[in-house]
Design a protein with these regions (language model features):
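Short, aromatic/His-centered strand-loop micro-motif at the edge of beta-sheets
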Residues: 232-252
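Activation corresponds to long, low-complexity, non-globular regions
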Residues: 102-136, 145-152, 310-390
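C-terminal motif of bacterial Sec signal peptides marking the signal peptidase cleavage site
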Residues: 20-23
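Carbohydrate-binding surfaces in secreted/extracellular proteins
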Residues: 247-283
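Ser/Thr/Gly/Pro-rich low-complexity, disordered linker/stalk segments of secreted
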Residues: 31-100
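Bacterial signal peptide processing site
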Residues: 25-27
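Secretory/extracellular carbohydrate-interaction modules
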Residues: 110-225, 386-390
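Flexible glycan-contacting loops in extracellular carbohydrate-active proteins
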Residues: 289-315
Length: 390
C-alpha cells in the first residue's frame, strides 16, 4: 500500500446513464502531508494555492468517533516518470490485466448473437469502501482504469452520503431521495462513443416544525456553460453536470473530490478533478454549490461498474480501482482504504449474464458481460464478501 501511495498524489452525449443506486455497505486510509497542486479557480479567492480547511463544524470529543483507518507515515509525493511527457495513447498503451485468466471471454459471434435479441443489461457490480459510518471527510481520491471500455459503460468512482448536520439542527427532518446516498461521480462512455465525466447531487428535502418543506438543489458554479441538461429525474430528482473528457481504455486516472467554501455565498462547494497519469495533466471538471454551509462527505462511499444500454450488454467491460483514500474532517489526516464489500446488485429481469470480481495486492477489479449464465443468486457466479488490497 505504501508503494502505491507514492503514486497517489503526484499532483497535488448521446445517452445519459441514470443508474441503479447500490445498496449500502461499510471503510479505512494516506499520509498526513501532501503537496496540493490542484489550483482551484472556484475556491482560491486571492490565494494562488487554496486553503482547503474543511467547511464543517468540529464536533466535541464526545461526538467524535474513533477512526478505524490505519494512519500511514507521511511520504513525499514523487513525480511519475510516465508523466514527464505526453505519450501516444494509441501506440504506447501499457499491458493490462490478463482478464481471460479470471473470466470466460465470449467470442465476437457470441456477443453479436446475444445483442441482437438482448432486452437486459449486463451484471451490475458494486464495491462499498470500508469507511466507518460516522467518519466525516472533506476530500476523497481514487485511481481507476478500464482496460475494456465499450460504449454504454459507467465507471462510478464515488457514491456517497453528505453530512447535513448543519441543516438537521434547523429542521425537523432532512432527507434525500435515497437513504444514505447524496451524490455520485465518475466517468462514462456514451452510446455514440463520446467519453464524459459526470457528477450528480440529489435534492435535499428539509421539513420544518409546521410541516413546510424546503427543497435545496445544488447549483453548478463551474463550468459556467454546459450543453447537457442540468436537472435529472427518474431515480429521484437533482442536478448533474456532464463534461466531455476523453479518458482512454487501458490508462490510469485519478478522480479527486474536494469540499471548500464559496467566496460569494459562504456555502460548501464540491469540486471534481481528474488527473491523467500518462500526461501529468490535472483538470477541474465541474463544481457545485450545495446551498448550505458546513457540509462534507460522511461514511461509506461506493464504486460500481454499470452497463446502461441494453443493445450493448453483450460487450465485455472492466474496471480496476486502486489507492482510495479520504481526508478526515476532524483529524485532518489522510487515511488509505484497504478493503471493500463487493457484490452483485439486482437480478432478472433487468440484469443477466456473467461476471467476476475480486482484489489483489494492488487493486479491486471487476468484469462483466451479458453473455453467459452466472447471474445474481443462482450460485454459479462470484459470491459477495469483503475483499482487501495491499
Amino acid at each position: 500500500m505504501k508503494q502505491l501511495w507514492k503514486r497517489l498524489f503526484p499532483i497535488g452525449l448521446a445517452t445519459l446513464s441514470l443508474c441503479m443506486i447500490p445498496s449500502c455497505g461499510n471503510q479505512s486510509t494516506p499520509t498526513n502531508e501532501r503537496d496540493n497542486t490542484f489550483e482551484s479557480p472556484i475556491l482560491s479567492g486571492e490565494s494562488d494555492t487554496p486553503d482547503i480547511t474543511p467547511d464543517v463544524d468540529t464536533p466535541s470529543q464526545a461526538e467524535s468517533a474513533t477512526n478505524s483507518g490505519d494512519l500511514l507515515a507521511p511520504e513525499p509525493p514523487v513525480e511519475s516518470s510516465e508523466a514527464s511527457a505526453p505519450v501516444d495513447q494509441d501506440e504506447d498503451r501499457p499491458d493490462g490485466r490478463n482478464w481471460s485468466s479470471v473470466f470466460a471471454m465470449p467470442t465476437a459471434d457470441e456477443i453479436n448473437a446475444y445483442q441482437n435479441q438482448s432486452t437486459h443489461r449486463a451484471p451490475y457490480i458494486t464495491g462499498w469502501l470500508s469507511i466507518p459510518g460516522d467518519t466525516r471527510y472533506t476530500e476523497y481520491v481514487v485511481d481507476f482504469k478500464a482496460d475494456l471500455l465499450p460504449d454504454g459503460t459507467y465507471c462510478c468512482l464515488g457514491n456517497w452520503q453528505m453530512d447535513y448536520s448543519y441543516l438537521e439542527r434547523q429542521y425537523t427532518s432532512v432527507r434525500t431521495e435515497y437513504s444514505g446516498v447524496s451524490g455520485y461521480a465518475g466517468f462514462q462512455s456514451l452510446g455514440d462513443g463520446t467519453r464524459v465525466s459526470i457528477m450528480s447531487f440529489w435534492d435535499v428535502y428539509c421539513t420544518d416544525a409546521d410541516g413546510s418543506v424546503t427543497t435545496i438543489r445544488a447549483q453548478r458554479v463551474y463550468p459556467e456553460v454546459t450543453d447537457q441538461t442540468e436537472d435529472f429525474s427518474g431515480e429521484g430528482t437533482g442536478a448533474h453536470c456532464i463534461v466531455p473528457y476523453n479518458w482512454k481504455a487501458g490508462y490510469w486516472y485519478q478522480m479527486h473530490l474536494k469540499c471548500g467554501v464559496s467566496q460569494s455565498t459562504g456555502n460548501t462547494i464540491v469540486e471534481q478533478w481528474v488527473y491523467d497519469y500518462a500526461t501529468g495533466e490535472s483538470t477541474l471538471l465541474c463544481a457545485y454549490d450545495l446551498g448550505a454551509p458546513n457540509v462534507c462527505f460522511k461514511g461509506a462511499s461506493a464504486f460500481f461498474l454499470e452497463n446502461f444500454l441494453e443493445p450493448l450488454s453483450g460487450e465485455v467491460r472492466t474496471m480496476e480501482v486502486r489507492t482510495p483514500a479520504y481526508l478526515d474532517a476532524d483529524t485532518q489526516e489522510w487515511y488509505a482504504i484497504a478493503s471493500a464489500e463487493m457484490h452483485s446488485e439486482g437480478g432478472l429481469p433487468q440484469y443477466e449474464g456473467s461476471y467476476n470480481f475480486g482484489a489483489d495486492s494492488e487493486c479491486f477489479w471487476m468484469i462483466t458481460s451479458g453473455v453467459g449464465g452466472d447471474w445474481y443468486g443462482n450460485g454459479t457466479g462470484q459470491q459477495g464478501g469483503t475483499f482487501s488490497i495491499g
